[in-house]
UniProtKB/Swiss-Prot annotation:
Its EC number is 1.14.18.-. Cu cation B binds at residues 279, 305. It is found in: Membrane. Gene3D superfamilies: Di-copper center containing domain from catechol oxidase. The keyword Membrane applies. Disruption phenotype: Abolishes the formation of phomopsin A. It comes from Diaporthe leptostromiformis. This is Tyrosinase-like protein phomQ1'. Binds 2 copper ions per subunit.
Length: 378
């Protein structure tokens, strides 16, 4: 209607033409009415346009950026702690909750477990959650869903712990994380048959000889997963294997190397250096299940990625205004799209969660102290 009034003066001209067929005096007598009608219509048009412009500006200011209206801050965030700072009782409670998930039935496939569902979901979304802008936000949400499962299904009441591997960078295989009593068990059986990717069955600790349902596949542009029951497998790189490689991996998780990563000035430089450097060093050291997209088969995966999330959190806290909602990078795993253009990732992108939870926008998980996340690190 606005466009009709502005671009079609015939609506007004028709009245003028009708009165032109009358006497001159009649035309003169009705001119004030015509002018008044024209004035009223002009006022209406201008008022509507002005109102529309005001509404448009308000919508832009409210939704056109990612930081003008962030989620509300929570008042009492939970605190995630380093594994070795937990009491033996707290460590036992966490391990018991993880074991609980391994006995609950799957929602995806009969004969598998709820724990297996997290492995399945991680593998299915590999193109979006690795070597892409969403690498850090996706895993932050993934850890949240896992933590909620421990609480909702297994009665766990604490926060997800993390493994600060910089404390073990001089000797990763001696970390207390591998303790058979207060940890997750150690290396695979050195005398056993190789299961996958240099790994052998873990035979000590709370997850000894446990069965895992899924194996990850990577073909073409997409990641996939196949059903292939096998034992939890690890194959630590030790001095006798390759001293040069071991020294390199120890160097990648050293405090000085991690400090270099934290000094990166922007998100893309930070996440690219982090993912290919300190982050990747851990699966390359552990091998076995940990070396593939079905890495969550190993319960230590969650403590490893909680530390990854912690270091991102620390990087964000150095400049909250500039970094809390900063994201940049390819929208999908660029390694599997060679020769094809990969679009730029956006904070408005929806992250697929592999059936573990509703797909969610990246911007919803950027601030750990806001919205539904509500946690921080000690």
């Amino acid at each position: 209607m606005l466009w009709t009034l502005m671009s079609n003066p015939i609506l007004i001209g028709q009245s003028t033409h009708y009165y032109d067929s009358r006497s001159s005096s009649l035309r003169q007598r009705n001119q004030p009415k015509q002018l008044l009608l024209l004035l009223l219509r002009t006022i209406i048009v201008v008022s509507v346009i002005t109102f529309a412009a005001i509404i448009g500006c308000w919508v832009f200011l409210s939704h056109g950026t990612t930081t003008t209206n962030p989620p509300q801050q929570c008042s009492t965030p939970a605190v995630r702690k380093e594994w070795r700072s937990l009491s033996p009782s707290a460590q036992a409670k966490y391990i018991s909750a993880v074991q609980c998930l391994m006995y609950l039935p799957s929602v995806h496939k009969e004969g598998t477990t709820l724990y297996d569902d997290f492995v399945f979901g991680h593998s299915k979304t590999g193109s979006y959650s690795h070597y892409a802008a969403s690498f850090l936000p996706w895993h932050r949400m993934y850890l949240h869903v896992y933590e909620r499962a421990l609480r909702d299904h297994c009665g766990y009441s604490e926060s997800l712990p993390y493994w600060d591997w910089t404390l073990d960078s001089h000797h990763l295989s001696a970390s207390p994380i591998w303790d058979p009593v207060t940890g997750f068990g150690g290396d695979g059986n050195p005398g056993g048959a190789e299961t996958l990717h240099g790994g052998r069955c873990v035979v000590d600790g709370p997850f000894a000889n446990s069965t895992r349902a899924w194996r990850a596949l990577s073909e073409g542009h997409n990641h996939d997963v196949e059903y292939g029951p096998h034992c939890l497998s690890r194959g630590f790189i030790i001095n006798n294997d390759d001293r040069t490689t071991l020294d390199m991996l120890h160097g990648l998780v050293s405090p000085s190397r991690v400090a270099q990563t934290l000094d990166k000035p922007d998100y893309i430089a930070f996440f690219e250096d982090f993912e290919s450097g300190p982050h990747n060093a851990i699966p390359q050291f552990i091998r076995g299940d940990f070396l593939t997209f079905s890495a969550p088969n190993d319960p230590v995966f969650y403590l490893h990625h909680a530390n990854v999330d912690r270091l991102w959190w620390l990087w964000q806290q150095r400049d909250p205004v500039g970094r809390l909602y900063q994201v940049r990078g390819p929208a999908k795993d660029f390694r599997y799209h060679e020769g094809h253009e990969v679009s730029e990732g956006s904070i408005e992108d929806v992250m697929p969660m592999g059936g573990l939870a509703e797909d969610i926008k990246m911007k919803s998980v950027m601030d750990t102290r806001a919205g539904f996340l509500c946690y921080e690190y000690e």
